[in-house]
């Protein structure tokens, strides 16, 4: 096997080598059945067993309470921007949203197509370098739900606390930091996460929803987007993204073998401490995000001279350090260090950054 590169892509992101090797071994002949998982009927006993095990492993990893449904859906997190208000926002109601970057802004824009949205707080007041404290938020009296994104992949802002919503259902986009550290699922009404960062390949979104929030969809809500329909049909109202679901199940198995989300928290803390520590000690690289809002998963940084960006990226690619270019909306660099990347990937990046700084500072 040729040497694997270190993939710092924000998504679709790196997958564990062990997962890819397992999928490769099972590609043509899954457990002696003589066919690939991609060829299985989603109604077959074998595939149903794959799907059920994936769900149970995810429940185990996150300690999901029994009064929550776990759904494996299609359309990615972006479809949830519409699906959430269609299911949870009454036509004459209002939903509270917190805007901390591009993804939460997209969620707000989509929700406005279906009803009234109150932007309770915005990081724009801090130039998207910090998250407003909840004492600054202007929440509605009777909001249908409170929505926020726990981690903004593009700007590199992450909540290190859970908002207090009282009796209002708390809805969170955890696409980029789910499974990176322990969470208390019972604090949320609904959690959703696109798969292609910390769960598996693209084509899948996981939704964890409290049962009392089911059955609230508008009459105009398409059947395919009704959470209750999805829950009642075991996420198989139509043919699901079978192979993405299977691969995600392999990732869940790998996570359990690694020690679960508690072990991932330690691993991710070491990675982010190493990378931010190097950036902060350098006079050549900068990250302006407030320290208590810095993302553990997505680390944006800039070089002292942006004219060196192309040379930096070319040198990184030559060393097998891939996809470090920042998002087109913000520029600079971005290292996405999800669960699948180990500390050795960060050490390789820091080593190259130090070398490049020595040559160009």
Swiss-Prot record:
GO molecular function: O-phospho-L-serine:2-oxoglutarate aminotransferase activity; pyridoxal phosphate binding
Cofactor binding description: Binds 1 pyridoxal phosphate per subunit.
EC number: 2.6.1.52
Entries under CDD domains matching the protein: PSAT_like
Keyword entries, A-Z: Amino-acid biosynthesis, Aminotransferase, Cytoplasm, Pyridoxal phosphate, Pyridoxine biosynthesis, Serine biosynthesis, Transferase
Residue positions, PTM N6-(pyridoxal phosphate)lysine: 197
InterPro entries, sorted: Aminotrans_V_dom (IPR000192), Pser_aminoTfrase (IPR022278), PyrdxlP-dep_Trfase (IPR015424), PyrdxlP-dep_Trfase_major (IPR015421), PyrdxlP-dep_Trfase_small (IPR015422)
Subunit organization: Homodimer.
Protein name: Phosphoserine aminotransferase
């Amino acid at each position: 096997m040729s040497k694997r590169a270190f993939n710092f892509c924000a998504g679709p992101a790196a997958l564990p080598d062990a997962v890819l090797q397992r999928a490769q071994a099972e590609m043509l002949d899954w457990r002696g059945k003589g066919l690939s998982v991609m060829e299985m009927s989603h109604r077959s006993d074998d595939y149903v067993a794959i799907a059920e095990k994936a769900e149970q492993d995810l429940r185990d990893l996150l300690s999901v309470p029994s009064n929550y449904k776990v759904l494996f859906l299609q359309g990615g997190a972006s479809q949830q921007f519409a699906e959430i208000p269609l299911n949870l926002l009454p036509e004459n109601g209002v939903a509270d949203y917190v805007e901390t970057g591009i993804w939460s802004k997209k969620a707000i824009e989509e929700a406005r197509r279906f009803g009234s949205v109150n932007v309770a707080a915005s990081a724009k007041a801090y130039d998207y370098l910090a998250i407003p404290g909840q004492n600054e938020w202007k929440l509605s009296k009777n909001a249908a739900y409170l929505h926020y994104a726990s981690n903004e992949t593009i700007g590199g802002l992450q909540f290190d606390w859970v908002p207090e919503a009282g009796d209002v259902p708390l809805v969170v986009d955890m696409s980029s930091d789910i499974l990176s550290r322990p969470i208390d699922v019972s604090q949320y009404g609904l959690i959703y996460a696109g798969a292609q960062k910390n769960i598996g390949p693209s084509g899948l979104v996981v939704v964890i929803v409290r049962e009392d929030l089911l059955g609230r969809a508008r009459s105009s809500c398409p059947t395919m987007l009704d959470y209750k329909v999805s829950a009642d049909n075991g996420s198989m109202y139509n043919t699901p993204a079978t192979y993405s679901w299977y691969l995600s199940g392999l990732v869940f198995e790998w996570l359990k073998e690694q020690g679960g989300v508690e072990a991932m928290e330690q691993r991710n803390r070491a990675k982010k401490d190493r990378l931010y520590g190097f950036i902060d000690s350098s006079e050549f690289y900068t990250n302006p995000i407030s320290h208590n809002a810095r993302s553990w998963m997505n680390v944006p940084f800039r070089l002292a001279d942006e004219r060196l960006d192309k040379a930096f990226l070319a040198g990184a690619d030559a060393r097998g350090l891939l996809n470090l270019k920042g998002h087109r909306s913000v520029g600079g660099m971005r290292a996405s260090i999800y669960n699948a990347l180990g500390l050795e990937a960060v050490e390789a990046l820091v080593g190259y950054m130090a070398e490049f700084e020595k040559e160009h500072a």
